[in-house]
Amino acid sequence: MFQYVKTLQYPINIKKKDLRMAHLIVTQYGGANGELGAALRYLNQRFTMPDDKGKALLTDIGTEELGHVEMICTMLYQLTKGATIQELKDVGLDTFYAEHGNDIFPTNAAGVPFTSGYFASVGDPIANLSEDMAAEEKARATYENLINLTNDPDIIGPLLFLRQREIIHFNRFKELYKEYKKKGYQ
């Protein structure tokens, strides 16, 4: 069902190591408003959508979110590439290194590991779409916060792209929500 394309949705070429930003951006991988949770949320909710249109939308967006996971992980790798132990210690990433070495692992910015408790799936298309719209808005706000924390255009560019995709996803969910409300789904 899935087809892997070996290019990112937006080119990422971060030239400067920035461990502080990596420490913050990891939240969009494994945090409550991050891309991993979004992908799993939508790919699970799709099964109980009442029609093929809803199933297709959640599948499309859930699959795109997996691409966003790849983008965030690429950013994390490029932001930390070549970091010394002392540099990791200086920004508080030594505790992360102690458990994961140089691997990328889904946590929030405080180091709390990803949990499926970050998202809900209740089998009700209206409730699920409401959850999905809220999730997209929270992700958008998080991207805006991250953008405000850097001046590096190599970081800002991908973050702006991801922010814009959150807005588009919100609008697509909103359209389906309104359609389902008109059809009388509860």
Predicted features and spans:
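Non-heme di-metal
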Residues: 1-186
